[in-house]
């Protein structure tokens, strides 16, 4: 597993802890996203780093029992300091419908630090 693939798994573990149990450190989580980060969730909205920060602060522990499973993880393209990755994310919560999305992410590396530049999610019907 590449460091970029490992980061996909690690960040979803942190998100599961933050959103599902309210555990973790939001500032450390937000530091993993570049200041010019852009996210396109399944709704089609465009969320920048500030919008992501507002979302994470507001949603701490808001999804009790959240479990996130990442599979079908593949590196589409890589270069010396970055990669484009594609993966399936399955979210489950007690008494809630299963939420499945396919995601494409652009990650960059500076030294030993990996950061997220872009995340585009598409809901699986």
Label the model's feature ranges.
Residues 2-28, 38-125:
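A beta-strand edge to alpha-helix "cap/lid" segment located at domain peripheries
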């Amino acid at each position: 597993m590449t460091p970029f693939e490992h980061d996909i798994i690690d960040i979803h573990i942190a998100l599961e802890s933050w959103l599902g149990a309210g555990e973790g450190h939001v500032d450390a989580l937000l530091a993993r996203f570049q200041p010019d980060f852009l996210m396109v969730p399944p709704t089609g909205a465009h969320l920048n780093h500030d919008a992501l920060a507002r979302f994470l602060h507001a949603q701490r522990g808001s999804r009790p029992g959240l479990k996130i499973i990442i599979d079908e993880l593949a590196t589409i393209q890589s270069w010396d300091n970055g990669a484009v990755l594609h993966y399936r994310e399955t979210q489950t919560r007690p008494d809630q419908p299963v939420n499945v999305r396919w995601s494409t992410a652009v990650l960059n590396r500076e030294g030993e630090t990996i950061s997220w530049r872009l995340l585009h999610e598409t809901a699986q019907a």
